[in-house]
């Protein structure tokens, strides 16, 4: 499937290079891009490899769901802590710690699975070790994104902020796109080979980034302004938009396969292929939104939020009314495009609303809110699906409509940094 997407990927890669007008050195931009790319690939590997390992070694499906949910909860708490920590200690040390966390978690997962395949540990112990590996990732690596965002914000003008942050988030999405290709190439050597390979890649990137990011960044050694609250008057609308957007996206990802079977009657054997194409189209659309669209038009954050929420609401309406698989694919592509605009506008808008000494804290808080939907959706969306397969998407549509209302109801934040 990845071989069919060279043009969007090429367009995205060309747009990663910062313009001369930006204050972010090209060396730093490349380093941050590689970090996010690696995280994106690693995320795809876990979603692809964990089900196979669990089925092979007897871990129950319900137990697997906890491996997703518990680290997501840990991520939402730790990302805010790391964001504040980067305001005090600097961005560089937090970014480097995130790479170490990624490497350790991949090795711990692979090592536990090897012990399981060798018959040295049972399913219960294996589950605990895999869960621990994911908690290590959440605990140490959840600071990578907010610290990287704050690193960029401190070096670019407000006018260039959305485009610079767009390249950062798009590189994670590009990693999600490239992940299946990595899996296809390396699993021929063993199901765990991609985990060892990405851990080795992380070590190389850590050594290179350690030499590239020479500055800790503004805030190193300083006293942070204090804990930010999602109820802060400057941030209430942004945090509400993030929560609604996160819930909508998580509901789509976690119920789509069931929706295809229960609403369209797609055969079980065809579901992985159908969902795979849907997610591929969504990822490509997100990548195009955050690179080609944003880099070309350079809209303001509030405009991005309004466009993204509006497109998402229309896309979920399409999912609700869909009676053909190709309509589902079109709707999920629209969801990806809207999600890309909405999240980017939300991240940039929140950064505009606070002072320079609060950039790490707001980036961490924003990341936590975008993670919260993945905690709520497994229970809420699946419960709604049991009543009617369309209900999760009706709830998601209402959520994006609420996000649209919140975006339209507030003024563009003025730069306070």
What would you call each of these model-derived segments?
Residues 133-172:
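Cytoplasmic helix-loop-helix junction between adjacent transmembrane helices
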Residues 301-346:
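C-terminal transmembrane helical hairpin of 12-TM major facilitator-type secondary transporters
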Residues 100-123, 311-323:
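C-terminal ends and interior cores of transmembrane alpha-helices
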Residues 78-91, 288-301, 385:
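Helix-to-loop junctions at the C-terminal end of transmembrane segments
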Residues 50, 143-156, 341-354:
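Intracellular juxtamembrane helix-capping segments at the cytosolic ends
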Residues 22-72, 237-241, 245-265, 271:
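Helix-loop boundary and gating motifs at the non-cytosolic
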